[in-house]
Curated annotation (Swiss-Prot):
The gene is OCLN. This is Occludin. Residues 90-135, 196-243 are extracellular. Residues 426-489 form a coiled coil. The chain crosses the membrane at residues 67-89, 136-160, 171-195, 244-265. It comes from Homo sapiens.
Length: 522
């Protein structure tokens, strides 16, 4: 699910304004940053944790698989009905013609000779002459229809009831394998069925081809009115409408299984690409209320620069250290600070800005004690002196707040207004968005580099608390800890941190300009 920090700017909605000449890509940030090309995106559109896959919808890949499985169930029932309706004629053939030579009721020696040939050829062909037995072909078709019916029913039921098994990659791999096997078998069964219900399709070049063609040729040419027609012979030579429908449905089932394989592969790829928290298998409300629009967010930012928020009574250091600072001067109820340590310093004026994209920024806001003075996040000092690690004072280098610097927020805002005045055309809006995307990538790269140092310091701090002071692990971790602290105190680190502050202010200003222009257009 989404984990946007509190009061962070809402995602920009590309459907609010869509010029005809602009069609941003939806998956620009789907892969690695160094692989994907840099294309233009709407302002503040990059929230990878907010990209949700609604797999509960019928239009999603799993939903399409459910629809196709239903269609296969219906088509299997139709095939069973069509093929079963013609079995009676094959039973008649078996009882009257397999035993030997049978002629027509009348017609003289000519028809009698045809009757002998038909009785001999047809009876002999039911297993001895190399012909496909119509009864065997229809039985094969019915068996495959039954297997497809069972498989499609299992896929549909497991998907509709939303079982845990149907939400795994292994499940869709099984669907791919079963669909491929059944699709191939249905294709073979359909071809065999065509050969069985259409004897002329298999008689060319065979031993009894001329006899079968002579028997069935009378049904392919106009016959005289009133001529007696043997119904059994007619159904043997002519493809019935039910049989034609069964053939068409057989090929449609093959196409349906091919589509199931396609969407199952697509589902597996999406499950590999996105995290489980980004996939919704059940319909639910992600947000209780709609996020505020750009205008309200800008007003909140303006109001936040004037009023200092009320101090929290107790704040737990969630990122910088596992220790908690409370208003009464305790650190996890182990260390006490005198009252003069936080009442002797006057309250400085603090500019509080909202975080941009990184969820870690949520923990980087200035701290305030109950006495009203400003406190920066700091590492606690060790309970006792430890060799190899320098003492961490109250003003440690653990603060990662980018809202303080040599240049005030008002001065930065004036600079950005001169550089990025209000938008007056779509071309200018396109230029602003390209600048926003470029700045966003630079900001994310710098902030990721700074965050890595902070995370490593936090990890080493926890390890130092676990190791014995005399151990080699403790000394190695202490050396690395001190080295990273020197890195944080370097001019290069401070320059990057200040540059992140400027980039954040720039991106916020560009977003405001784009939002103002979009509201004017609407």
């Amino acid at each position: 699910m989404s984990s946007r920090p509190l009061e962070s700017p809402p995602p920009y909605r590309p459907d609010e304004f869509k010029p005809n000449h602009y069609a941003p890509s939806n998956d620009i940030y789907g892969g690695e940053m160094h692989v994907r090309p840099m294309l233009s995106q709407p302002a503040y559109s990059f929230y990878p944790e907010d990209e949700i896959l609604h797999f509960y919808k019928w239009t999603s890949p799993p939903g399409v698989i459910r629809i196709l499985s239903m269609l296969i169930i219906v088509m299997c029932i139709a095939i069973f009905a069509c093929v079963a309706s013609t079995l009676a004629w094959d039973r008649g053939y078996g009882t009257s013609l397999l035993g030997g030579s049978v002629g027509y009721p009348y017609g003289g020696s000519g028809f009698g000779s045809y009757g002998s040939g038909y009785g001999y050829g047809y009876g002999y062909g039911y297993g001895y002459g190399g012909y496909t037995d119509p009864r065997a072909a229809k039985g094969f078709m019915l068996a495959m229809a039954a297997f497809c019916f069972i498989a499609a029913l299992v896929i549909f039921v497991t998907s509709v009831i939303r079982s845990e098994m149907s939400r795994t990659r292994r499940y869709y791999l099984s669907v791919i394998i079963v669909s491929a096997i059944l699709g191939i078998m249905v294709f073979i069964a359909t071809i065999v069925y065509i050969m069985g219900v259409n004897p002329t399709a298999q008689s060319s070049g065979s031993l009894y081809g001329s006899q079968i063609y002579a028997l069935c040729n009378q049904f392919y040419t106009p016959a005289a009115t009133g001529l007696y027609v043997d119904q059994y012979l007619y159904h043997y030579c002519v493809v019935d409408p039910q049989e034609a429908i069964a053939i068409v449905l057989g090929f449609m089932i093959i196409v349906a299984f091919a589509l199931i394989i396609f969407f199952a592969v697509k589902t597996r790829r999406k499950m590999d690409r996105y995290d489980k928290s980004n996939i919704l298998w059940d319909k639910e409300h992600i947000y209780d209320e709609q996020p505020p629009n750009v205008e309200e967010w800008v007003k909140n930012v303006s109001a936040g620069t004037q009023d200092v928020p009320s101090p929290p009574s107790d704040y737990v250091e969630r990122v910088d250290s596992p220790m908690a600072y409370s208003s009464n001067g305790k650190v996890n109820d182990k260390r006490f600070y005198p009252e003069s340590s936080y009442k002797s310093t006057p309250v400085p004026e603090v500019v509080q800005e909202l975080p941009l994209t990184s969820p870690v920024d949520d923990f980087r806001q200035p701290r305030y004690s109950s006495g009203g003075n400003f406190e920066t996040p700091s590492k606690r000092a060790p309970a006792k002196g430890r060799a190899g690690r320098s003492k961490r004072t109250e003003q440690d280098h653990y603060e990662t707040d980018y809202t303080t610097g040599g240049e005030s927020c008002d001065e930065l805002e004036e600079d950005w207004i001169r550089e990025y005045p209000p938008i007056t055309s779509d071309q200018q809006r396109q230029l602003y968005k390209r600048n926003f995307d470029t700045g966003l990538q630079e900001y994310k790269s710098l902030q990721s580099e700074l965050d890595e140092i902070n995370k490593e310091l936090s990890r080493l701090d926890k390890e130092l608390d676990d190791y014995r002071e005399e151990s080699e692990e403790y000394m190695a971790a202490a050396d690395e800890y001190n080295r990273l602290k020197q890195v944080k105190g370097s001019a290069d680190y401070k320059s990057k941190k200040n540059h992140c502050k400027q980039l954040k202010s720039k991106l916020s200003h560009i977003k405001k300009m784009v939002g103002d222009y979009d509201r004017q257009k609407t």
